[in-house]
UniProtKB/Swiss-Prot annotation:
One GO molecular-function entry: DNA-binding transcription factor activity, RNA polymerase II-specific
Annotated region of DNA binding: 13-39
Function: Affects sucrose utilization and alpha-glucosidase activity. Probable transcriptional activator.
Taxonomic lineage: Eukaryota, Fungi, Dikarya, Ascomycota, Saccharomycotina
Domain of life: Eukaryota
Protein name: Probable sucrose utilization protein SUC1
Record's keyword annotation contains Transmembrane helix: no
Alphabetized InterPro entries for the sequence: Carb_Metab_Trans_Reg (IPR050797), Transcription_factor_dom_fun (IPR007219), Zn2-C6_fun-type_DNA-bd_sf (IPR036864), Zn2Cys6_DnaBD (IPR001138)
Length: 501
């Protein structure tokens, strides 16, 4: 048979066809004879070529042919722009200095053009804003209607992202959507989901190349400026999260900082730039040490010079007097939190040195006094507006202060500890999630201080009522007479520190 000629069609017997073996077409065929089978040809020949189209197949083909670009009106949003606008305006007015990465006017324009990616980003931002202001004891300042607060912005964001298959083509918008979903989830206390969203944002940023300086060379000035802000915002957020949740740091401080000359709101960005410095001064290796602080790995003695350098550079962080209170609170708390962590790692590695101010045992006592002096004019609302992260940082500063007091036996630090505890307790009255172990440790330290003061008063001639026969400490502490010195008949107030300064 010639090479290009097609073999004739054959029809094997029923048995060979069923067994899917070659039939020699004899009657009966040799395989049926060999296997003692009846050789028949009774099966009905099936129709060749295309069959009748099924309704389900027709519908699938129609859906495929009608599929449009995600930016068209094939996606039907559940929320109109008027439902998104209150949260977007709150971001523009109050939170741009914290997350200076979005132009609300540009976002609104894209949403009106049915851009699904912009709509998903607006939903994520709205969820983040609502969960952020939920911690504020009096959030009437933000004027968000009650019906808007009840909307499921996270669910709608996920629906929009699923429609556009966002993972296939990472963009700055998809990065920011993942970031604001992280903010929304962390404020709800959903730590695993929050970590996953932040890691997703970081991965997409690396795919785009935000961690490489070469990426910015071919970009227009405005776009490159925004990209740098996004990268540093991710870096700051990741470094806090990694200490909070003991997860390894990924992002390096690997690109040039952004310029204030390229920014429309330079006052707000100046504060953000100082915040970036707070988290950039310690290297990634130092952050790894922060995370491993509970491990037995020790740092070499020469590291003390590096830790001292970090403390001095953190000391140089300054804040513009015209910066918003929310931004001031964020920067000041972050700065002293980082200084407290640096002292803590110094102590953990036995590198304390009383001849170096920043490395001495009493340094946290000095830090706490400076910290309280810097925040005295900042309203409580500014701390609340920064979300639960501010409480975590305050507790870290306070526990480091307790370590310093215990090591130095310097009770002068108790006044600062009480004032910090007062601030934390006020924040605790909101819906913020308080790390219980650290909170209880501060409470126990202050209780011990009160007992020491009471017994000291007794030894100096003050009146101490008898403890009940069962030795109840509660009975002792609740007896009002322990607060007075002098005679039982005419008690006079003893030393009670004024912690409400």
């Amino acid at each position: 048979m010639s090479k290009g000629k097609r073999a004739p069609y054959t029809r094997p017997c029923d048995s060979c066809s069923f067994r899917k073996v070659k039939c020699d077409m004899k009657t009966p065929c040799s395989r049926c004879v060999l296997n003692n089978l009846k050789c028949t040809n009774n099966r009905i020949r099936k129709k060749c070529g295309p069959k009748k189209i099924r309704d389900r197949t027709r519908e699938a083909i129609n859906n495929l042919s009608n599929k449009e670009d995600p930016k068209t009106n094939s996606f039907i949003p559940h929320f109109q722009l008027d439902k998104l606008q209150p949260c977007l305006e709150t971001y523009q007015t109050w939170y741009y200095g914290i997350w200076p990465v979005l132009s609300i006017s540009d976002l609104n324009m894209k949403i009106t053009k049915r851009d699904v990616s912009a709509y998903a980003l607006a939903c994520a931002l709205s969820a983040a804003i609502l969960n952020q202001i939920d911690f504020i004891s009096n959030n009437g300042t933000y004027c968000i209607p009650e019906d808007v607060k009840k909307l499921d912005f996270i669910g709608e964001c996920i629906r929009a992202r699923t429609f556009m298959n966002y993972q296939m083509t990472p963009t700055l918008e998809t990065i920011l959507t993942s970031f604001f979903l992280h903010v929304a989830e962390v404020n709800k206390g959903s730590k695993p989901a929050a970590i996953i969203y932040l890691r997703e944002a970081i991965t997409m940023a690396q795919i785009i190349g935000l961690h490489n300086e070469s990426t910015y060379k071919s970009k227009p000035v405005a776009e490159a400026h925004r990209m740098r802000k996004i990268y540093f915002m991710l870096m700051v957020t990741e470094r806090f999260m990694c200490i909070d949740d003991l997860i390894p740091v990924v992002l390096e401080n690997s690109i040039k900082e952004f310029s204030l000359d390229d920014e429309q709101y330079s006052v707000l960005i100046d504060g953000f730039k100082e915040l970036v410095k707070v988290f950039s001064i310690p290297s990634k290796a130092i952050f790894d040490r922060f995370i491993q602080m509970n491990d037995s790995i020790s740092m070499p003695p020469e590291t003390a010079g590096l830790l001292n350098k970090i403390q001095l550079e953190l000391e140089s962080i300054c804040i513009s007097p015209v910066a918003p209170d929310i931004q001031k609170a964020n920067i000041i708390v972050s700065k002293y939190w980082m200084k407290a962590l640096t002292w803590k790692i110094t102590r953990k590695n036995n590198l304390l040195d009383d001849f170096v101010t920043t490395l001495c045992v009493k340094y946290p006592i000095e830090l706490s006094e400076q910290f309280l002096g810097e925040i005295k004019s900042i309203p409580l609302r500014a701390f609340e507006s920064n979300g639960p992260g501010v409480v975590f940082k305050l507790l870290s500063i306070a526990t480091v202060l307790i370590d310093s007091i215990n090591l130095s036996n310097d009770v002068s630090g108790y006044e600062s500890l009480q004032r910090m505890f007062d601030l934390i307790s006020k924040l605790k009255k909101t819906d913020m999630i308080i790390p219980r172990r650290e909170y209880d440790r501060i409470k126990e330290a202050l209780t011990k201080m009160e007992i020491d003061i009471f017994f000291s008063s007794a030894q100096s001639g003050g009146y101490i009522s008898e403890v009940e026969s069962n030795g109840s400490l509660d009975a002792f502490l609740t007896d009002p007479l322990v607060f007075y010195s002098g005679s039982n008949d005419n008690p006079t107030p003893s030393y009670i520190p004024d912690y409400q300064k």
